């Protein structure tokens, strides 16, 4: 039976997760892209806790942009700015990027490049 796009993404994500893991000092920066919003989290895989989570539906994003739920590249870049700012406040200056099985193109690429520009990932 042929795999759906989502099943292929999950398969890629599992393959990536075998090689990538985050610690408390350098957490894993994972993301999720839905049709209506964009979510990003910093995760410590040793304890299994999410250190920090930001989305385009969150209060910080709504306060900064004046609208709820953004799915454009500009919205994704704003989510990256908020995430990096909150990470710096918590004392996190480096993270490992996990593209969650999504192709490195469009919103995923814009998010990663903005985080790189702001110094969170290499």
Swiss-Prot record:
GO cellular component, one term: cytosolic large ribosomal subunit
GO BP, sorted A to Z: translation
CDD domains: Ribosomal_L18_L5e (cd00432)
Keyword Transit peptide: no
Transmembrane intervals: none
GO MF assignments: 5S rRNA binding; structural constituent of ribosome
Domain of life: Bacteria
Cited function: This is one of the proteins that bind and probably mediate the attachment of the 5S RNA into the large ribosomal subunit, where it forms part of the central protuberance.
This protein's name: Large ribosomal subunit protein uL18
Source organism: Hydrogenobaculum sp. (strain Y04AAS1)
Gene behind this protein: rplR
């Amino acid at each position: 039976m042929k795999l759906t796009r989502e099943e292929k993404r999950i398969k890629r994500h599992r393959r990536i997760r075998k090689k990538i893991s985050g610690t408390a000092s350098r957490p894993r920066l994972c993301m999720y892209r839905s049709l209506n919003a964009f979510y990003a989290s910093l995760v410590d895989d040793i304890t299994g806790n999410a250190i920090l989570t930001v989305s385009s539906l969150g209060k910080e994003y709504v306060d900064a942009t004046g609208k709820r739920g953004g799915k454009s590249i500009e919205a994704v870049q704003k989510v990256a700015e908020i995430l990096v700012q909150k990470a710096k406040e918590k004392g996190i200056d480096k993270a490992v990027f996990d593209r969650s099985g999504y192709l490195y193109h469009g919103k995923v690429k814009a998010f990663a490049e903005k985080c790189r520009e702001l110094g969170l990932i290499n």
